[in-house]
């Protein structure tokens, strides 16, 4: 079930119509990033469609008032899963503040930090009857060249080849929980 289905963002449609009428590099860069984000969402949707996800509630393209963008929220009977997609490449590490950093360029990515902020926001708005539901966060790495250094804990990282097995486990665990309730 889709609470909020995957759709083409309005901003992306608007920028596509403007890109041929302007030489603004900011507009072109924003269009590129939105297109990339939308393509990653479709890639994940293709993997999600390979499993039985009829018992999942999916909220696609969630953005908070703090401009934190979560690509997908999946709610099952036994957990809430927050996903943020990217295509970072190369060796990265997680610093002491929980920031993901490219070990070559030292570019800092706030994905994990944003997921954790969102996690605590979700926990705070859950009704008291649902507070026992765990909230899991996954920063999904679609680029096959992404590597995490051996000193960084990979708990919030989901590599491309791990996506489908992770979704299958989610589906199995959710079905088991449903059977226990019946």
Regions found by a protein language model. Give the residues of each.
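Active-site beta-strand-loop-beta-strand hairpin of nuclease catalytic cores
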Residues: 74-99
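Surface-exposed interaction regions that form or flank ligand-binding interfaces
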Residues: 1-68, 75-79, 102-182
């Amino acid at each position: 079930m889709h609470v909020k289905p995957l759709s083409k963002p309005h901003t992306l449609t608007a920028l596509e119509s403007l890109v041929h009428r302007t030489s603004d590099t900011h507009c072109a860069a924003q269009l590129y990033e939105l297109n990339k984000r939308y393509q990653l969402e479709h890639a994940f949707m293709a993997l999600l469609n390979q499993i039985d996800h009829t018992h999942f509630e999916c909220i696609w393209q969630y953005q908070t008032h703090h401009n934190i963008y979560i690509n997908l929220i999946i709610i099952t009977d036994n957990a809430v899963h927050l996903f943020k997609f990217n295509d970072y490449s190369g060796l990265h590490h997680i610093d002491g503040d929980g920031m993901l950093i490219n070990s070559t360029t030292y570019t800092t990515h706030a994905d994990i930090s944003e997921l954790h902020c969102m996690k605590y926001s979700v926990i705070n708005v859950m009704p008291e009857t649902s507070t026992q539901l765990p909230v899991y966060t996954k920063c999904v790495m679609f680029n096959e060249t992404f590597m995490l250094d051996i000193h960084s804990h990979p708990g919030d990282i989901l590599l491309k080849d791990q996506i489908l097995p992770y979704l299958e486990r989610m589906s199995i665990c959710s079905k088991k929980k449903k059977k226990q309730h019946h």
